[in-house]
């Protein structure tokens, strides 16, 4: 089953009949319009390409304009591709709504996490700070040793050090689907998802469900 492209609206909570509070993220999934269908003969694999939302006419490039015109759909803010499994068929110009998640229990949500800029090891990797006193005057939040000796004589790749934190692709798996509101194009999932309010999200049925 394919996924859909949505937009993070924010977080709220809903109550069960027993009065239990469930934190939920509201994802707005407007109709995804099919712009291209790829097949084995021409592309070597089966996939469907979709767009959603709108884009100002003066922001659409000529190649994009031609691509959308060929598909006969309105220009959207993004293009995303989903692999097709056996038996799944879509046609160019078709609209796919949030209703495809009506019978789905869990989803995987992918987004771009909030960027935190250049961060030290304490914030980025949860390193312990060193002594505040007892003779320590300069090295309170420094990482400490980053290597060994003349052998190996280098810092190993992947060493946890200070650097860019956030602003990377993150997937949160197996979030419970709490509600599907087809009338308002909303999907409510339990818990938090990556990214800032208003950012694009990719929602797929959970691979581990």
Swiss-Prot record:
PROSITE patterns: RIBOSOMAL_L3. Gene3D superfamilies: 3.30.160.810, Translation factors (2.40.30.10). The keyword DNA-binding does not apply. GO terms for cellular component: cytosolic large ribosomal subunit. Part of the 50S ribosomal subunit. Forms a cluster with proteins L14 and L19. PANTHER family: 50S RIBOSOMAL PROTEIN L3, LARGE RIBOSOMAL SUBUNIT PROTEIN UL3C. One of the primary rRNA binding proteins, it binds directly near the 3'-end of the 23S rRNA, where it nucleates assembly of the 50S subunit. This is Large ribosomal subunit protein uL3. It comes from Pectobacterium carotovorum subsp. carotovorum (strain PC1).
């Amino acid at each position: 089953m394919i996924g859909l492209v949505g937009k993070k609206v924010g977080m709220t909570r809903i109550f069960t009949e027993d009065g239990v509070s469930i934190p939920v993220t509201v994802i707005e999934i407007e109709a995804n319009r099919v712009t291209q269908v790829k097949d084995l003969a021409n592309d070597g694999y089966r996939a469907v390409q979709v767009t959603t939302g709108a884009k100002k006419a003066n922001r659409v490039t000529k190649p994009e304009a031609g691509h959308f015109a060929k598909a006969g759909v309105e220009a959207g803010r993004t293009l995303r591709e989903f692999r097709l499994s056996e038996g799944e068929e879509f046609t160019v110009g078709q609209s796919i709504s949030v209703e495809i998640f009506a019978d789905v229990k869990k989803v995987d949500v992918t987004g771009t996490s909030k960027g935190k800029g250049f961060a030290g090891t304490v914030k980025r990797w949860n390193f312990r700070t060193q002594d505040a006193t007892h003779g320590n005057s300069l090295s309170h939040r420094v990482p400490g040793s980053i290597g060994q000796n003349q052998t190996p004589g280098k810092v190993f790749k992947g060493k946890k050090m200070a650097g860019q934190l956030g602003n990377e692709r993150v997937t949160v798996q197996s979030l419970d689907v709490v509600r599907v509101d087809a009338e308002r194009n909303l999907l409510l999932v339990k818990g938090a998802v990556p990214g800032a309010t208003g950012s694009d999200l990719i929602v797929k049925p959970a691979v581990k469900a």
